Design a protein with these regions (language model features):
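Structured catalytic-domain cores with a bias toward divalent-metal coordination
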Residues: 2-18, 36-368
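Bacterial N-terminal signal peptides
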Residues: 20-31
């Protein structure tokens, strides 16, 4: 498509793997000692890098009740000691912009400019990517951001998430989980700030969300707190004492340059916040804070017709869209239960009973 990045295949990815001053004092006080310092090599799977090096490889998940999996991974190590930052994308293999953004970071991060270590996973759900299946891993039908911390003896999804938990989450200091609109989701960019109730930890992750620069931030105060049933990647990191952020950009199977740039530049800004790169971060100054989100689902099967676009502000009771039967008769109307902003809306006509029509957010009256 004109104006878009060309989308690399999984084989291409495998080959190519081969704000400001106020935040610095805050992070220095709270982050504690980095997970990695000194001249030793750092390895994740077959990717092993020493100071000033970049390495690519795979994190192999052995076969069990179903097929094994090789997860593409890269390690980029700076020339100076510092924290470990993990960047994970592709839990949903058709969220293409986020996959391409992390792959671009693998190519462009310069170890000579860096302090610390970056672990990069551009594509967790390779089967979803290759088969163009949204939302789930087609090998076992499971959502790869709903089964953390995984199981060593589970299905492919569970075994993969167990490996990510052990080999990446437990070895990093900071983590960013990359997502976006799936094939059927027309999404506006936004991020999730995990509000855990730990004031010191929440202050750091709030600064990370601001530094990333997306202008809409969802306050996620309801993430699981049990490390043994953490469900999401960001919650898995948080329940293990890490500083985690989730970001969303990209929509409906596209790889728009502005979405890729937002994810790449946001990552570089966070790295500056963490003193992993020189320079100052570029935080968003006046974000829209979302205090709660709601998923609106269809009560009927048929043809979906949206009436609002991503990012639209709608009043309580306003019609967001409707579903017709295959003869054109309206069988369901979707309305906003509160005044809200549309975070994403279904991008395709296909609709089954129980499918998501839209996810909307209620804007906070004042910043947290």
């Amino acid at each position: 498509m004109s104006g878009m990045y060309s989308l690399p295949t999984i084989h291409t990815i495998g080959r190519r793997l081969i704000l400001r001053a106020f935040a610095a004092g805050l992070l220095a006080a709270l982050a504690g000692p980095p997970a990695v310092a000194g001249p030793e090599t750092f390895a994740v799977g077959t990717a092993s890098a020493g100071p000033g090096q970049r390495a690519t490889g795979v994190l192999s998940v052995p076969a069990g009740s179903d097929a094994g999996l090789d997860i593409p991974v890269a390690v980029v190590r700076g020339t100076r000691s510092g924290p470990v930052l993990a960047l994970v994308a592709g839990a949903h293999g058709t969220e293409y912009a986020s996959i391409v953004a992390v792959e671009k970071l693998i190519e462009t991060l310069d170890p000579a400019e860096m302090s610390g270590t970056v672990i990069l996973v551009p594509l967790l759900n390779t089967a979803s990517f290759e088969q163009k299946v949204p939302h789930v891993n087609p090998i076992d039908g499971k959502n790869m951001n709903r089964f953390y911390p995984g199981k060593a003896d589970g299905t492919q999804t569970e075994r993969a998430l167990f490996a990510v938990t052990k080999q990446i989450v437990e070895r990093c200091d900071y983590l960013v989980d990359f997502h976006g609109g799936d094939l059927d989701e027309d999404l506006r960019p936004y991020s999730y700030w995990l509000k855990t109730g730990n004031e010191k930890r929440d202050a750091v992750t709030r600064q990370m969300a601001l530094a990333f620069g997306l202008d809409t931030i969802v306050i996620a105060a309801d993430r699981p707190t049990d490390p043994g049933a953490s469900r999401y990647l960001d919650a898995t990191a948080a329940t293990r004492g890490k500083f985690a952020l989730t970001v969303e950009a990209g929509r409906a199977g596209t790889v728009a340059p502005e979405d890729v740039s937002a994810l790449v530049n946001g990552t570089l800004s966070v790295m500056r916040l963490l003193k992993m790169l020189p320079g100052a971060p570029s935080p968003v100054e006046h974000p829209v804070w979302i205090e709660s989100i709601e998923t609106i689902t269809s009560e009927q099967t048929g043809i979906f017709r949206p009436l609002v676009a991503r990012g639209a502000y709608v009043a309580e009771g306003m019609k967001i869209g409707y579903v017709t039967d295959y003869g054109g008769r309206t069988v369901f109307e979707a309305r906003a239960q509160k005044a809200c902003v549309v975070l994403y809306v279904c991008a395709v006509p296909s609709m089954k009973k129980g499918d998501t029509i839209a996810t909307v957010g209620v804007v906070a009256v004042s910043p947290p």
